[in-house]
From Swiss-Prot:
Active site: 59 (proton donor)
Chief location: cytoplasm
Protein name: Uncharacterized oxidoreductase C8E4.04
Naturally occurring in which organism (per UniProt): Schizosaccharomyces pombe (strain 972 / ATCC 24843)
Class of the enzyme per the UniProt entry, highest EC level: oxidoreductase
Length: 325
């Protein structure tokens, strides 16, 4: 198959949600995308064929994302937009206000998915990272059940189509499922060949909760300050990419691996050429998938180190090291 055909695959690759609706398989991640870069990145992605844009209030670039959407000329109804509730708005009365702020910044009437970004609460109020006189973060005891029930009420407003979660461990996931009238449609988490989380992924498949993978290129983002070689330089991915022919990159292989596993995937870039080159779906063979699955490196890069307690104990590589907000 040619690059052109792989790009066509990417445009046509969707996952079906339990109600029959579809979520695009490859989206654009925007964490740490600067305000001056975001609009052009979003516009370039949509013009290249992406139909899935991921953002969050804490990223501070929702206004620019909205501008990029409008500048692209792609109809709003053709685009899946995900955003996330930040930790300082977990109180029930603040959840709808936080959504309104996101909609105002995006200049959209609705978003497709709204996720709880992290399962713990910071002090309610205008400060995104409230600190005491010692410089320590100030947390607030807001039960996740309260926040989830407030999220459920958003569905009645027509301003959000689906609700979900991000960075939840088994404990928080099970607490939500125990009281949910509407269970999460999506769980966004760190997933890549260095952190496949196969057992946790299978649990979500059984629950019919779609998993969306952030940081699919693992330690490509310099914010992770990784002490191991970059995933996209790993010999296994390089060899598969080379065997696939000119124009295929190790990043394409990592992204296609994620899609083949049944997860939507959110590679981040502000470089137009990389945005375009990332948007390929290569149906990997069972042999190629097995080779990637057997890489043997296990490393989590997003530990939520700013959380009040370790977030991923009991999950693959749950020892805190780095922070991802």
């Amino acid at each position: 198959m040619s690059i052109k055909e792989f790009a066509k695959n990417a445009r046509e690759a969707y996952f079906t949600l339990p109600n029959g609706d579809k979520i695009p398989s490859i989206g654009l991640g925007t964490w740490r995308s600067g305000k001056d870069e975001t609009k052009n990145a979003v516009c370039a992605a949509l013009k290249a064929g992406y139909r899935h844009i991921d953002t969050a209030h804490i990223y501070g670039n929702e206004k620019e994302i909205g501008e990029g959407i409008r500048e692209s000329g792609v109809p709003r109804t053709d685009i899946w937009v995900t955003s996330k509730l930040w930790c300082n708005a977990h109180r029930a009365g603040l959840v709808p206000l936080a959504l309104e702020k996101t909609l105002q910044d995006l200049n959209l009437e609705y978003i497709d998915a709204y996720l709880i970004h992290w399962p713990f609460a910071l002090l309610s109020g205008p400060e995104e990272l409230p600190r005491n006189e010692k410089g320590e973060l100030i947390y607030e005891d807001v039960p996740i059940e309260e926040t989830w029930q407030a999220m459920e009420e958003l569905l009645e407003t027509g301003k959000v189509r689906y609700i979900g979660i991000s960075n939840f461990n088994n404990e928080y996931l099970d607490r939500v499922l125990k009281i949910a009238k509407v269970k999460p449609t999506i769980h966004q988490m760190e997933l890549h060949p260095y952190l496949p989380q196969t057992e946790y992924l299978e649990k979500h498949k059984k629950l019919q909760i779609h998993v969306s993978a952030y940081s699919p290129l693992a330690n490509q983002n310099d914010a992770y300050n990784s002490d191991i070689s970059k995933l996209i330089e790993h010999k296994t991915l390089v060899d598969i990419a080379n065997a696939r022919g000119e124009g295929i990159t190790p990043a394409n292989i990592a992204i296609s691996w994620a899609v083949k596993r049944g997860t939507s995937v959110l590679p981040k870039s502000v470089n137009e050429s990389r945005i375009v080159s990332n948007f390929l779906y290569i149906p990997l063979t069972d042999k190629e998938m097995e080779a990637i699955n057997n890489i043997g490196v296990v490393r989590r890069f997003s530990h939520g180190k700013f959380a009040p307690k370790p977030m991923f104990v009991g999950l693959q590589d749950g020892t805190p090291k780095q922070t991802h907000a």
